Design a protein with these regions (language model features):
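Membrane-interfacial helix-loop segments of redox and metal-homeostasis proteins
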Residues: 1-371
Length: 371
């Protein structure tokens, strides 16, 4: 009886984690960059580039994985009668938070999901990101305990919940039918891509399972700290375990802090970037993956958030905020990447903005006592 209860509680979330890990491995084997089989931040950066929102030629492509995630989540929510069109909870603040979550993630060179995938590939530089991510979540937990809230969303017309899905389906149509309207990378990460059908299918599977299991990278650590509930965290660990085992079997596991794919060794700024992403994710109620799932379920506030993320990706590359990967020069010299002064300033500004949003969304009694 106890075994059945355990399976009922953890079975779906573990299956979702394993599926995400397998999807990441398949996508990498099919052409996506190494240690980047699935990365919400990287995919949004590429989509922003494909739409001409930034001019970084190496990161431009409409990633079907994102389209699949949202459509899969919408289909799962409709089938389970959980689709709810709602909006109206601090949309402007959510847009800004989405921007800075993305800026922080691109300083690190990956979203929380890619952080786990990088760890599963043996990338020791991602440990700094994990430490920062946990620290940011802990700050967010303190904010929640103080009463932080972006407010309540209210029901809206059903059609509102399908707007984002419709936009993404239109992008898929452009990709397949009128690709000349879009920009495509001829070199760099944007040029490394799986066949669109494989990418779309992987996104659909992940979207369905993530919707049903409530999979969330930030939520797992938040619930473990606040509620001593390790259910969501088990999904986080399942992704890491699956990717690690898969890489070992495939011979692509490389335990090192040097020459890792699309990664840099400025550990402090990796940690700070992910701290910004972690804190912002808690204030938003979920990591970037979770925001896309919620948007697929009809949540207009999450739709605004992910649009903010796309703008954040564009801003990161237009103003040189994103991290640059370590590389090896022609003469064999190891060149450390990382971020420049603009990126450092953006992270500092991001922390200030998150603090301001936190203070202005505390209960009045808490805000008064703080003053």
């Amino acid at each position: 009886m106890r075994e059945k209860s355990w399976f009922r509680e953890y079975g779906l979330i573990l299956a979702a984690g394993v599926a995400v890990g397998i999807a990441a491995l398949i996508l990498t084997a099919s052409g996506n960059p190494k240690n980047m089989g699935f990365c919400i931040a990287c995919f949004l950066r590429d989509i922003a580039g494909a739409l001409g929102l930034h001019s970084a030629a190496n990161v431009q492509y409409i990633r079907p994985e994102i389209i699949g995630i949202v459509v899969g989540a919408a289909a799962a929510a409709l089938a389970a009668r959980e689709f709810r069109a709602k909006a109206g909870a601090s949309p402007a603040c959510r847009f800004v938070l989405g921007m800075f979550v993305m800026i922080g993630a691109l300083v690190f060179l990956g979203c929380p999901l890619r952080m786990v995938i990088r760890l599963g590939g043996g990338d020791l530089t991602a440990v700094a990101g994990l430490v920062g991510f946990i620290a940011g979540i802990l700050v967010g937990v303190v904010c929640l305990k103080k009463g932080f809230s972006l407010g309540r969303a209210y029901p809206v017309r059903m059609g509102e919940g399908f707007v984002l899905s419709g936009i993404l389906m239109a992008l898929l149509g452009l990709l397949l039918l009128v690709p000349t309207l879009l920009k495509f990378s001829e070199a760099g990460p944007g040029s490394m891509r799986a066949f669109w059908g494989i990418s779309l299918a992987a996104g659909l599977v992940v979207g369905v399972l993530a919707q049903r299991s409530r999979l969330c990278m930030a939520g797992g650590i938040r619930d473990a700290v606040m509620l001593r509930d390790f259910k969501l965290l088990s999904g986080f660990l399942a992704i890491w375990g699956t990717v690690t085992i898969g890489n070992l079997v495939l011979g692509s596991y490389s335990l090192s802090a040097l020459s890792q794919p699309i990664a840099h060794s400025q550990y402090l700024w990796s940690a700070l970037g992910m701290a910004l992403a972690g804190w912002g994710s808690i204030l938003l109620g979920g990591c970037p993956l979770r925001q896309w799932i919620l948007a697929g379920e009809g949540n207009g506030d999450s739709a605004v958030t992910v649009l903010g993320m796309i703008v954040g990706a564009a801003v990161s590359h237009n103003f040189g905020l994103a991290g640059a990967a370590d590389s090896v020069a022609e003469d064999g010299t190891y060149v450390v990447g990382g971020i420049g002064t603009a990126g450092m300033a953006a992270v500092a500004i991001g922390f200030a903005v998150l603090l301001a949003i936190t203070v202005t969304h505390l209960p009045k009694t808490e805000a008064v006592s703080r003053d």
